[in-house]
Amino acid sequence: LLAGSGSAAVTAYRIDPSAPAAFVAHALRADGRILVAACPPQGTPLAIAPDDVAVDIRLDITLDAAEPGVRITAATAHLLGSLTWVEGEDRALLLASSRASACHCAIVGEDPLERVREIAAGSGGRLGVITCERVMLHCVSGVSSHDIEEILDIDSADAAAAPSASWSPQAIMDAHEAVSAVGQLG
C-alpha cells in the first residue's frame, strides 16, 4: 500500500482535525520516506502550511477490492508522521533523485513516482515528504503494526522465516475470475 497503490488521504490533525483530508498521490522511497503530491484547496491546513516546516499529519491509504458491483475495502494502512512541503530547487532535486522501493505498483503496474511527478507539476500542485516510524495495517490477516525499517527490509531472514498469508495480485485476479465464472448464487 505504501508503494503507491490504493487511495491515500492526508489530514493535518494538529492544525485543524475537522478539516477534510486532502487526497494525494504517494510513493514509498527506497530510504523509507513517503513522497506525496497534492493540490490542496485554498485555505485548507495543507494549502497554508509553509514550505520546509514539518506538519504533524495522519496518512490513510485504502485499497478497495477489484469488484465493480460492490464497494469492498480489502486493506487499509494508517500512520502518523511529519509532512514537509518542498519547493524550488529542492523539489526538482528530490524528484530527480527519487527511487521508489518498488519500480511499479504491484496492483496496477504503474510507476507511482510518475503519478507523484504529474500532480506536483500541475496547477496548485505541491510536493511533500512524509517521515514516520510505524505503520498500522488492517487486512484479511488482521491488524498489525510495522516499523518502517521492517517494511524496507523485505529480504531479511525474519521475512523469509514468516511467509505472508497475502495473495499476489495475479492470484487475486485468478480467484476473482473463478468466482465470477460460477455466477450468482440463489
List where the protein language model places each region.
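Short hydrophobic-aromatic micro-motifs
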Residues: 33-38, 79, 84, 128-130, ...
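Short, structured beta-strand-loop surface elements
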Residues: 40-110
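Anion-coordinating catalytic cores for phosphoryl-, nucleotidyl-, and glycosidic chemistry
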Residues: 1-5, 45-48, 74, 125, ...
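An N-terminal domain-cap segment
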Residues: 1-48
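Short beta-strand segments
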Residues: 29, 60, 131
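A general structural signal for short secondary-structure junctions and capping/turn motifs
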Residues: 1-2, 26, 49-51, 69-70, ...
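Residues at beta-strand starts and edge strands
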Residues: 6, 32, 53-57, 77, ...
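C-terminal edge-of-domain segments
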Residues: 95-186
